[in-house]
Amino acid sequence: MADQRMDISSTISDFMSPGPTDLLSSSLGTSGVDCNRKRKGSSTDYQESMDTDKDDPHGRLEYTEHQGRIKNAREAHSQIEKRRRDKMNSFIDELASLVPTCNAMSRKLDKLTVLRMAVQHMKTLRGATNPYTEANYKPTFLSDDELKHLILRAADGFLFVVGCDRGKILFVSESVFKILNYSQNDLIGQSLFDYLHPKDIAKVKEQLSSSDTAPRERLIDAKTGLPVKTDITPGPSRLCSGARRSFFCRMKCNRPSVKVEDKDFPSTCSKKKADRKSFCTIHSTGYLKSWPPTKMGLDEDNEPDNEGCNLSCLVAIGRLHSHVVPQPVNGEIRVKSMEYVSRHAIDGKFVFVDQRATAILAYLPQELLGTSCYEYFHQDDIGHLAECHRQVLQTREKITTNCYKFKIKDGSFITLRSRWFSFMNPWTKEVEYIVSTNTVVLANVLEGGDPTFPQLTASPHSMDSMLPSGEGGPKRTHPTVPGIPGGTRAGAGKIGRMIAEEIMEIHRIRGSSPSSCGSSPLNITSTPPPDASSPGGKKILNGGTPDIPSSGLLSGQAQENPGYPYSDSSSILGENPHIGIDMIDNDQGSSSPSNDEAAMAVIMSLLEADAGLGGPVDFSDLPWPL
């Protein structure tokens, strides 16, 4: 029995102990379970957590609350961001409604464009520091029509608006009929240049230039990159000083035509003088302003370049201008004398005239420019003024002339007194121009002996005494030129050029630098060589030094000086008593292409000789006798 029990126990133990196969299968089973756990770790963890939640219901509740808080926080942040965006958009829309450039857009702009336009608008408002705008000039109790009539009545003129691009008359008041005798319908839509004097067109075009007005800015859309079209209606604009305009011009006057016989016009000069009366001098005062083309009722161009461009116009009041005639003042009331400033070339030609001269002489500045002052001097005062002309070219001091007569536009003479001084270029040491301050002298000042204006010590020399005739020869009577009033001499403008040539010759012979006309046409047309004879037939001796005559042009006696070619009787002004029409005819008769080429060749030889670049100069090719 005991042996049977031992066998049964050993058999059971063998059966219960794992064999090699069992160990392999057991190991494979264990590894398979591990792999399943690795592949299904998340599900296992979830199951474990579910088991844990089942085991702990309080933890499950906390997890649910945490997930709800996260979801609520996300929803609250989205709502906050949405409200912030809505508020910003509302502010952007409100800002766009306040900015005129944005409000005028036909489509909605992006935020960046709105902000850019707002910044530009703020800069514009900051720059508008001048409180005097157009709206401030008009009282509140006056309407626009009442104010217009009051201004026209006070100014005694007419209001007109002219486009700066083509000079088209956009508007003119009815009062233009009282001044120009044109109706309102006759002028509106016409070109202003058709009614201007031909010599004043360039001046008016210069005044219509709108380069100094406010520049127009082109806005670019940030999304499309294309220029933004603006249809902004400008508010009250500032009257900046650069936009103001004040000028004189001559306009046609529509006077009734009267049939005149041909005998009433003996010459063409008198016809031109009669035609000159059809123009009247208008003083225009106003400013430049810009309007949208749609507001003016004009046709807009559909071109892209013209988009957003405003129309620049000249708004001005035209008044009939009449020159001031000085009246004698009775009593002890002293007022400031009327004067004007002019600038002349060294030959006496006008290169600048102050606008005050129009009120005194009735000439427009553009009428005097390019003409010689000797054309307006009385023939009895030319001798004294020519001597002053020579002195001011030779000295740096101010020269005060005696009282002289100056011809004004209507043919009469006005008494003036001038102070002349020459301006010398500090670098080239050359006289560039002469500045003249001309003061009107009243009749009572001449009669009363005002110490400010010293009396003439002697009667002024006439032109004939300054320019004596040939030795023992009788004086010729000069023919009168139709259209030129008496008191002046035809060809007197030649005197200034001859004086300039004489002074240039003096400086050149002395070896000093010539005057500023060395580079001007005066030096080309004249300047005889140093060994050439003077107009009187005298020659400069070799080695001789010219002497400046002390008496100048006023002396009537001949002074022999072999070393100076232009002294008194042999002066360039004293040799020919008839320098008027005779010298002009001689100069015109000797002008030809061949003569001009020969003259230029001689001049180039002179320049090379002065610079030491050439040999002796041959004067045999000159077309005129020396």
Swiss-Prot record:
Changing residue 78 to E: Phosphomimetic mutant which severely impairs DNA binding and CLOCK-BMAL1 transcriptional activity. Changing residue 88 to F: No effect on CLOCK binding. Changing residue 612 to E: Increased desensitization to CRY1, in the presence of CLOCK. Approximately 2-fold increase in CLOCK-BMAL1 transcriptional activity in the absence of CRY1. There is a cross-link at residue 252 (Glycyl lysine isopeptide (Lys-Gly) (interchain with G-Cter in SUMO2 and SUMO3)). Residues 484-493 have a biased composition (Gly residues). InterPro entries: bHLH_dom (IPR011598), Circadian_TF (IPR050933), HLH_DNA-bd_sf (IPR036638), Nuc_translocat (IPR001067), PAC (IPR001610), PAS (IPR000014), PAS-like_dom_sf (IPR035965), PAS_fold (IPR013767). There is conflicting data about the effect of NAD cofactors on activity. PubMed:11441146 suggests that the redox state of the cell can modulate the transcriptional activity of the CLOCK-BMAL1 heterodimer; NADH and NADPH enhance the DNA-binding activity of the heterodimer. PubMed:23229515 reports that NADH and NADPH have no significant effect on DNA-binding activity of the CLOCK-BMAL1 heterodimer. Ubiquitinated, leading to its proteasomal degradation. Deubiquitinated by USP9X. PROSITE patterns: BHLH, PAS. Residues 17-32, 511-521 have a biased composition (Low complexity). It is found in: Nucleus; Cytoplasm; Nucleus, PML body. The modification N6-acetyllysine is found at residue 538. The modification Phosphoserine is found at residues 17, 78, 90. Hair follicles (at protein level). Highly expressed in the adult brain, skeletal muscle and heart. Keywords: Acetylation, Activator, Biological rhythms, Cytoplasm, DNA-binding, Isopeptide bond, Nucleus, Phosphoprotein, Repeat, Transcription, Transcription regulation, Ubl conjugation. The modification Phosphothreonine is found at residue 21. The record marks 125 as: Important for interaction with CLOCK. A motif (Nuclear export signal 1) lies at residues 142-152. Component of the circadian clock oscillator which includes the CRY1/2 proteins, CLOCK or NPAS2,BMAL1 or BMAL2, CSNK1D and/or CSNK1E, TIMELESS and the PER1/2/3 proteins. Forms a heterodimer with CLOCK. The CLOCK-BMAL1 heterodimer is required for E-box-dependent transactivation, for CLOCK nuclear translocation and degradation, and, for phosphorylation of both CLOCK and BMAL1. Part of a nuclear complex which also includes RACK1 and PRKCA; RACK1 and PRKCA are recruited to the complex in a circadian manner. Interacts with NPAS2. Interacts with EZH2. Interacts with SUMO3. Interacts with SIRT1. This is Basic helix-loop-helix ARNT-like protein 1. It comes from Homo sapiens (Human).
